[in-house]
């Protein structure tokens, strides 16, 4: 039997998603909890591996098991063995054709940026921060150059294991709410560090360091050294993974973050 889980986690508490020998990753914590509840080792496959500091609101995993449990039993039983920084939100039996990674056709990330002369300790690990004003319109104009199917080598980490740098970026939204700017990135898939590298470039344009059309030149150059430095991970959230309707994957529970009302206005896909 194949079981899918919806998982949320505080990325600041972990060294990324992927299991490591030191055991301080989200995958390590989840698989330990599943093993405790099931009394047998269980291996998970994830929709998208997030880096250290990146949060998960709509992360999806699957695993195979012969155990017969109710859906909510998997939720409550696994959560009983998880730290407070990770939570299984739902569980659902799936057909063998479902695959958390390969069945997904799109991913959506949000970035929350706090723009204020002084950093807030209440937002540590929850939002990025910059002390200088930003030009929202300039960032929107720059983002427009990135929409479509392109070779995103200029925004790819040297450690990226993707077979191709070509991805289809469907949408970038920039929405201001008080001292916060909310960015939404939606694509069929993302390269390693791609969103954070895009953020670094958008912020550089917003600060007036480059004109909006500079980003078109960076994209065309297909050279990582042309782009701005990788932006901090603190405000990055994996919010949604899209699957074909036949799998009826439950929607991510975004109400757990204080800025969910702003995100709702951005019309998160279901």
Curated annotation (Swiss-Prot):
Broad EC category: isomerase
Q: Which reaction does it catalyse?
A: uridine(38/39/40) in tRNA = pseudouridine(38/39/40) in tRNA
Q: Which residues form the active site?
A: 51 (nucleophile)
EC identifiers of the protein: 5.4.99.12
One MF term in GO for this entry? RNA binding
Swiss-Prot/TrEMBL GO biological process terms: tRNA pseudouridine synthesis
In terms of Pfam families, this protein maps to:
PseudoU_synth_1 (PF01416)
Q: Which residues bind substrate?
A: 109
* Domain of life assignment: Bacteria
Keyword annotations: Isomerase, tRNA processing
HAMAP family cross-referenced by the UniProt entry: TruA
* Function per UniProt: Formation of pseudouridine at positions 38, 39 and 40 in the anticodon stem and loop of transfer RNAs.
Q: What family, per the record? A: Belongs to the tRNA pseudouridine synthase TruA family.
Q: How does it assemble?
A: Homodimer.
- Protein name as catalogued: tRNA pseudouridine synthase A
Native source species: Burkholderia ambifaria (strain ATCC BAA-244 / DSM 16087 / CCUG 44356 / LMG 19182 / AMMD) (Burkholderia cepacia (strain AMMD))
Which gene name does the record give?
A: truA
